[in-house]
Structures are given as structure tokens and as C-alpha cells.
UniProtKB/Swiss-Prot annotation:
CDD domains from the UniProt entry: Terminator_NusB
GO MF annotations, alphabetized: RNA binding
SUPFAM superfamilies tied to this protein: NusB-like
Described purpose of this protein according to its UniProt entry: Involved in transcription antitermination. Required for transcription of ribosomal RNA (rRNA) genes. Binds specifically to the boxA antiterminator sequence of the ribosomal RNA (rrn) operons.
NCBIfam families, sorted: nusB (TIGR01951)
Keywords: RNA-binding, Transcription, Transcription antitermination, Transcription regulation
Protein species of origin: Mycobacterium bovis (strain ATCC BAA-935 / AF2122/97)
GO biological process: DNA-templated transcription termination; transcription antitermination
Family: Belongs to the NusB family.
Source organism phylogeny: Bacteria, Bacillati, Actinomycetota, Actinomycetes, Mycobacteriales
Protein name: Transcription antitermination protein NusB
InterPro entries, per the entry: NusB-like_sf (IPR035926), NusB_fam (IPR011605), NusB_RsmB_TIM44 (IPR006027)
GO cellular component terms, A-Z: cytosol
Amino acid sequence: MSDRKPVRGRHQARKRAVDLLFEAEVRGISAAEVVDTRAALAEAKPDIARLHPYTAAVARGVSEHAAHIDDLITAHLRGWTLDRLPAVDRAILRVSVWELLHAADVPEPVVVDEAVQLAKELSTDDSPGFVNGVLGQVMLVTPQLRAAAQAVRGGA
């Protein structure tokens, strides 16, 4: 058995995805580009850890569906615009909305709980309640959005 501990599950993978989205926004590039850069760096330098597969999947998924995710978040903001939110809150919401829409193996309450926990760890005192409220509203429409996406994929 190896002494090297694996990444601590999906919570750490989500946290790293939030970090990557934040970095991408600051650098003005897509999260997928950041993932590609990190993968190349880990390949070139064996002492640099590879990204957790879930981190890469989330970051690439958010990049691929960015417009839809941002539209969905914006539709559920009350008294705020997406660009006025703290950048870390935007990243947390984007990761969480992607999971609500595309991570069928993650129960919705787990997605919200993880987002609130990340907001507690990474953002302002008001952010956990705000994130919880926005995601609670998004959760009301995700079953219909998932069903519509499935119908499109299934050719129906």
C-alpha cells in the first residue's frame, strides 16, 4: 500500500475546480485551458500532482456549458447581477449548477451542501446563505432541464 494519500474525495476536487474557475476568470481564459495547462505541467514534471479526474470533468463541463450555466444563475439572482458577485461565489455557483445539471450520480442536496461548505471555507460571511438561496431556486427547475437534455440526447 502506498503512503501517498489520494485527493480527499470529491469535496477537495470541487474546491480545486472552484480554484481553477477563479484562476481562469482572473487570467481571462477558459477553465478548460487551465486544465490543459495543468495537465501538461503534471506530465512534464512528475513531482507536480495530476488533477483529480472529477476536478477536470467539472472545469471542462463548466467551460463547455458556460453560457447556459450563467444564464441559469442570472435568472435566479434577486437584486444582483452575475458580474457584481464576488468571483469566488461565481465560481462556486458555476460548479454547483454544472453538478445539478450534469452530475446525475450526485444527489441535489449533496450539491447544495457542498456549495454552502465551500462558501463557508472560501468566501464572505454572507455567502453561504446567498449560495444556498440561489441553488435552492435553481433546484426547482433542474428536473425539467435534465429531462429536456435527456430528450435531446435521446433524439426525442
